[in-house]
Amino acid sequence: MRMHSVLMMVVATLAIANGSVSAAGGSNLRKAKATSSINSFNTVQTEAKNSRMLRNTDVATGENGHVYYYPAKKGERKPFIEVRLKKALSNSKKVNRLYEDWYKSGFSTKKVAKELNQSENRELKETYKTLAIGYTAFVKGKQSQQQLQ
């Protein structure tokens, strides 16, 4: 019985395919040939009827307000983070304030060293290592002050 069903399906499929091919062969395609080809060199550009913008905000302003752009002076490039960080860490008041904030927040020296050791940049690693060593010295100094009191 299964073989009979399979053969009937094959015959029906062939009959449908043959009927569609013969129907397509009888159609008149001369109208498609009679149309003239479009010459793209002679097309006229039309203006847009509306001035819809793709963005909701002005390009000159960002999400939080106006965006300022200060171009670098000739021959002068913006310093990388390493240079900025070393400059900021050369100020002892800022470094001590940073150590004080870490100390008040309860960060251990091991945690600070671990968090600062995640950079793959060689210059930053050296700077962060120096910073971690400085924090360790700061914590030891604080602990010795507390023991004296």
Curated annotation (Swiss-Prot):
InterPro entries in the record: RXLR
UniProt keywords, alphabetically: Host cytoplasm, Host nucleus, Secreted, Signal, Virulence
Up-regulation conditions: Expression is induced during host plant infection.
UniProt main location, coarse: secreted
Entries under Pfam families matching the protein: RXLR
Motif (RxLR-dEER): 52-77
GO cellular component, one term: extracellular region
Location(s) in or outside the cell: Secreted; Host nucleus, Host nucleolus; Host nucleus; Host cytoplasm
Domain of life: Eukaryota
Signal peptide start-end: 1-23
Domain comment in the entry: The RxLR-dEER motif acts to carry the protein into the host cell cytoplasm through binding to cell surface phosphatidylinositol-3-phosphate.
Family from the record: Belongs to the RxLR effector family.
Function: Effector that enhances P.infestans colonization of Nicotiana benthamiana leaves.
Protein name, entry field: RxLR effector protein PITG_18609
Organism: Phytophthora infestans (strain T30-4)
